[in-house]
């Protein structure tokens, strides 16, 4: 199930993201804070994914009533945006190395983040959560390519290329791990179970390239895919392409 950031009330979402109206101004000291609710939601999403995440489930985790949660969070849509922004806060700005080293750091940091919080891959952020961590992330990503002779739109496009590649590659990796978990079989076991019948159904002469390359990949990786190695290969090629662009200026 895909969630969409920006699906909640824009005003209430921004208030949550930036800590406005953190708690009621009058009355007894509340049992909860918005930050505690967000942390609980992230713990649950890490363990169970977004599909089972609900205000009721979060309330159970915190030992309060659902209405207590609604005092701080209007609904799941707004909460998801805050969860994304908080997760982005785990990312670290790149150091002062070359532009290539800075972009490589950004790609690897994003790749690692998606593996720590796979539920991020269930969220489409075409309308990004405009919180402090998201804004800071975009700022230091742009700084990584500032001063290279690129136009502003090109700078944005380079950042989108690198982060989009990291997200796409992480999705393959996370999905491969999930397939193994759900099936109870490794890739190698799955191919071994499929091979006997497959050999009777497929004529190698009809698919000479697929047969040859598939065999080479299987021998090299022990499976049909190797997400980590694909990430390394793809990242190098992405950076090579950016280098060609920068060199043309």
Question: Where does each model-flagged region fall?
Answer:
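Amphipathic alpha-helical segments used for helix-helix packing
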Residues: 84, 111-133, 140, 171, ...
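Helix-turn-helix
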Residues: 36, 40, 44, 48-77
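Amphipathic alpha-helical interaction segments
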Residues: 36, 57, 78, 105, ...
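A structured, mid-to-C-terminal "fold-capping" secondary-structure block
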Residues: 2-3, 185-249
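Alpha-helical structural segments
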Residues: 36-43, 78-93, 105-112, 136-143
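Hydrophobic alpha-helical connector segments
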Residues: 92-136, 152-155, 159-162
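N-terminal intrinsically disordered/low-complexity leader segments
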Residues: 1-31, 208-218
